[in-house]
Amino acid sequence: MKTLRCLFFLLTFAFPAFAQIEGNPENFCRNGFFPRESSEYKLASVKGGKNEKVYFYDDSGDCPNDENCRRKSYLIPNDEVIVSRNFGKWACGWYQPKKGSETVGWIALDKLEFKETSRNPARGDWLGAWNYAGNQIEIGKGKTADSLTITGDAFWKGLGDNVHVGELDDTSKPAGNELKIGENETGEYDCKVTMRLLGKYLIVSDNLQCGGLNVTFSGVYQKK
């Protein structure tokens, strides 16, 4: 990696915000794990009758296989969701509204119609300023026809003025719809990032070594 800088402002003790995916119950479906739990994400549209509500279901206890697991949040026909994996008759879905935060949870599989997406996107599809929850990733043209430059900023804000940040600055070549940073790094604390282009979404996952404590670039990004 060309450059990775980690800055700490008023560093204080804090508990890690992310647990390891290994060992999680099979019924877990949460936004913190979503960008890192699959390598085969899919796009789907919600289907249903006029004015039908397709509800999200919780992942606690014996959920989602119980009506008591039904949340208040719901989707309507033609809403677009990203699916990471299936669990029985359920799909773990991420819905990103035009404004506001995402909703992640179990959705009935029979209420989804999956879409075909390109596994070999054009170079231009990668280019631009991508944003998720205040984190930013900028992808530009590299010096060679098949390379891309990647810069980024991420932060985690704790109590008061306690802020931890991380930066990306590298060049890489996409392989299909994947773009990786630090793939050949061998150090225990080297930053590694995988970006997957899925339609208008950039699904980013890292190894939690790309910045200060609790900083991660993981998330589902969209162009500004």
Language-model features, listed with the residues they occupy:
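SH3/SH3-like beta-barrel superfamily modules
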Residues: I21-S39, N68-D110
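Tryptophan-anchored aromatic micro-motifs
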Residues: R119-E138, F217-K224
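N-terminal glycine/threonine-rich, aromatic-flanked beta-hairpin/loop signature
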Residues: Y132-N177, S205-N207
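Structured surface patches comprising rigid loops and adjacent beta-strands/short helices at the edges
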Residues: L109-T117
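Short, exposed beta-strand-loop hairpins at the edges of beta-sheets
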Residues: T194-R196, K200-T216
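Sec-dependent signal peptide recognition
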Residues: K2-F9
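Short alpha-helix capping/helix-loop boundary micro-motifs
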Residues: S60-R70, E116
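N-terminal signal peptide c-region/cleavage motif recognized by signal peptidases
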Residues: A14-A17
